[in-house]
Amino acid sequence: MTKTVRTCGKLYLAGEYSVLTAGQGAILKNIPIYMTGKIHFSERYQLFSDMFDHTVDLTPDDEYSLIQDTVAVMNEFLQSRSISLRPFFLTITGKMEQDGKKFGLGSSGSVVVLTIRAITALYGLALSAEETFKLATYVLLKRGDNGSMGDVACIAYEDLIYYQSFDRKRIAEQINESPLESILAQDWGTVIRRIQPHHPFDFFVGWTKEPAISRDLINQVKSAISSSFLTQTQEEVLRLEKALLAGEKEIMKESLEKVSHLLVELSPAIYNEKLIALKRASQGLDCVAKSSGAGGGDCGIALSFSETDSQILVERWRGAGIDLLYKERWGMDE
């Protein structure tokens, strides 16, 4: 019997870059543009992803290493629960791109969470969002990934969340010393809170159709991070979380403007011409817009508190060559 699962995309509202430092927070939103996994038991292991042009088994393959490593960890997890292993055929589709251009919504975390969900569905296991997050993070840490894991949290929880990063180095060092179950049972020091916005408003995702900055540039931006940047960003991230929960429109706008300004000060590479246009489109409107993620391309986000201004914002984006990728109504209408 074939099981079908899926994982969403994600975007940062605030806290990108700062959240790379343990103890720093960020706010992320799940985006319902999906990758899909189909899985069934088979006579031998077979893995296929539409990102590649070939099918593999568990023989090491550079292109499939992320999926294969996830399968290996999940097999270890299943055996720790005294579950007999059986081979399967896993198919993954959904590139989160258009005309070969990536939206910037997915991540390695998307693939790992999808693979975990597929395997647990096949074996009839029900994992919590926290368990899924920890397993996916374990896979990535074991591979040497040094990301914040905020994307993994957002994808695992499938919600608007506040995420506070933990000491990944400490957990990574234990991977070679302690069994999987022991590490999963620990308190990692992660903070993940779901956010239910109170004030009704529109959330928009604008796609620049340009790639994000290169890994080398990202590393340059990281090297510029100061204690002042971290302190100020954390203050605004927490203000934004409270404002979203309380429906305080002006504070939402102020906080997003401030974190946007902090990113501009951090590196001019974050806001390219398209992202500058995306942000400027909110000027004079009851809206606020900023870049999302690494910057230099991909997507930006906007909040609009007026139906009329929402239409104007989207028209301005269109005029600047920015596509409206996604729109969602947040909050509780009175």
List the model feature ranges, each with a label:
Residues 130-132:
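Short, charged, amphipathic alpha-helices and their helix-cap/turn boundaries
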Residues 105-107, 289-296:
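Short glycine/threonine-rich catalytic loop with a Thr-x-Gly-x-Asp
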Residues 104-127, 159:
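DPxDG-like acidic metal-binding loop motif
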Residues 90-94:
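Hydrophobic alpha-helical hairpins/lids featuring a short glycine-rich hinge
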Residues 2-14, 18-21, 28-84, 97-100, ...:
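C-terminal nucleotide
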